[in-house]
Amino acid sequence: MFDGIGFMELLLIGILGLVVLGPERLPVAVRSLTGWIRALKRMANSVKDELEQELKIDQLHADLKKAESKGLANLSPELQESIDQLKKAAESVNRPYKVEDTSPVAPKASPDESPSVVEAKSSEATSENSSTPK
């Protein structure tokens, strides 16, 4: 941290701080100064990390565009297999749902009705349908 500052320079800064600030305010000033330095280091590190992340994303985009321009011909077999799986999954999502069972469904019981009430209603409905003249 103090690469260019020797022991004598640090001692001189300490003595000047003691003379200017006094023994009561010097520790408080040193703590606040170190707090500011820590905050600046954290901010610089976060900016550096964000820039590195953006550069990695840009590099990935460039690699992807380069692969697309080559027609995806020189891809490894594992990567080609995963691309095929993704295409199949996308096609299955885009397909409309198939109706498997076309038989009539019995009405379901509501929470306040018992199964016997539902059976009675369904038998009434079937008897009404069969008794109506056609």
From Swiss-Prot:
Region annotation Disordered: where it falls in the sequence: 90-134
Keyword flag Metal-binding: no
Subcellular location: Cell inner membrane
Polar residues bias (residue ranges): 123-134
GO molecular function, one term: protein transmembrane transporter activity
UniProt-listed InterPro entries: TatA/B/E, TatB
Bilayer topology: Single-pass membrane protein
Record's GO cellular component terms: TAT protein transport complex
Family statement: Belongs to the TatB family.
Protein name listed in UniProt: Sec-independent protein translocase protein TatB
Lineage of the species this protein comes from: Bacteria, Pseudomonadati, Pseudomonadota, Gammaproteobacteria, Alteromonadales
